[in-house]
Amino acid sequence: MDQLKRSLLEAPIIEKNGYHYFVHPISDGVPKLDPGLLREIVIRIIRKAKLEDVDRIVTPAAMGIHISTAVSLMTDIPLTVIRKREYGLDDEVAISQQTGYSENEMYINDVREGEKVLVLDDVLSTGGTLAAVLDALDEIGAEVIDTVAVIKKVGGENKAADAGHDVKTLINVDVVDGEVVIVDEDGDS
């Protein structure tokens, strides 16, 4: 059994405002992130994502950063982090992020019209974060070459899909009776 699948099956489940989610090193930073798990994920992303002609990797803070940094190191593709803090730079674009359990403002800086980007994130659950990011990149005029989320939690709405965005995933899971259930161990192509 691969490390990603095993780690998800062992993940504790918590409830926050009626929303059940798993606590996992990739999505939450706890428990500790084993380097072998991160390596496995990075290799799978590199194999699954379209990387040809990508100018930059774009990821939302915070839990996409470690994944995207590792992919950047392996591919030599520069990385831009979408921050939760406003800097007031000339090219800054504000976006509203709505997830199953929170609502925040995020800010994209240093992404230009015509740039070809790979969007990476840790989890696709409601699709709120990725839908907002992908819509903002479209408004900027960046060309999204590919979008990959490590884990997809199925069973609810998917704002990214509803907005016409295709997102590849490495593994798809659901939470049933307080446990993670693997729905598709290969994710979405």
UniProtKB/Swiss-Prot annotation:
Its EC number is 2.4.2.-. One of its GO terms (molecular function) is transferase activity. Keywords: Purine salvage, Transferase. It comes from the Archaea. Gene3D superfamilies: 3.40.50.2020. GO terms for biological process: purine ribonucleoside salvage. Pfam families: Pribosyltran. It is an enzyme of class 2 (transferase). Belongs to the purine/pyrimidine phosphoribosyltransferase family. Archaeal HPRT subfamily. May catalyze a purine salvage reaction, the substrate is unknown. PANTHER family: HYPOXANTHINE/GUANINE PHOSPHORIBOSYLTRANSFERASE, XANTHINE PHOSPHORIBOSYLTRANSFERASE. This is HGPRTase-like protein 1. It comes from Haloterrigena turkmenica (strain ATCC 51198 / DSM 5511 / JCM 9101 / NCIMB 13204 / VKM B-1734 / 4k) (Halococcus turkmenicus).
